[in-house]
């Protein structure tokens, strides 16, 4: 992606501001969400958010650019339209904490975009409301997701796991 493309500073400035003052593990989680968002914009199916014709045009542009095709053709207004797809189960990480971080950051990105005054909000207000609804739905879906098994449980001694054995 070229540094002059409008999406580069928009996304980078947002994630930099969000990470400012956070702990190192949180900053790493934010960076993983940022990379997933960039990958989504470079490879994701945008037909749901943009419609079939703009999505087909974007797909054609992707044939010429490995990265940044989204920002070559589209801008922040279209980003708002596409963010609900980024909250779909296929783009959410399996780990609940990572998924929660992604959902939270998308919600905060929508708020940051809403504060910008260089948009024609009459055009994107419905898409913004749909994206906010998608954030709320993703939060509800995540709450219904089964809890992750504790991966270090096998490292505990049998007596701590309450498994029957010669210690009993």
Region spans (language model):
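Charge-rich, intrinsically disordered N-terminal extensions
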Residues: 1-92, 96-122, 131-168
């Amino acid at each position: 992606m070229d540094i002059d493309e409008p999406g580069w500073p928009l996304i980078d400035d947002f994630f930099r501001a969000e990470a400012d003052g956070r702990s190192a593990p949180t900053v790493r989680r934010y960076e993983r969400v940022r990379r997933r968002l960039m990958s989504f914009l470079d490879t994701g199916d945008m037909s749901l958010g943009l419609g079939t014709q703009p999505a087909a045009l974007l797909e054609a542009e992707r044939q010429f650019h490995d990265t940044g095709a989204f920002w070559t053709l589209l801008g922040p207004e279209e980003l708002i339209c596409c963010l609900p797809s980024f909250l779909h189960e296929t783009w959410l990480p399996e780990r609940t904490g990572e998924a929660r971080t992604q959902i939270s950051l998308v919600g905060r990105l929508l708020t940051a975009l809403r504060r910008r005054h260089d948009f024609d909000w009459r055009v994107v207000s419905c898409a913004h409301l749909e994206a906010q609804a998608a954030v709320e739905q993703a939060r509800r879906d995540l709450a219904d997701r089964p809890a992750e098994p504790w991966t270090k449980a096998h490292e505990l001694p049998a007596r701590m796991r309450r498994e029957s054995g010669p210690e009993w």
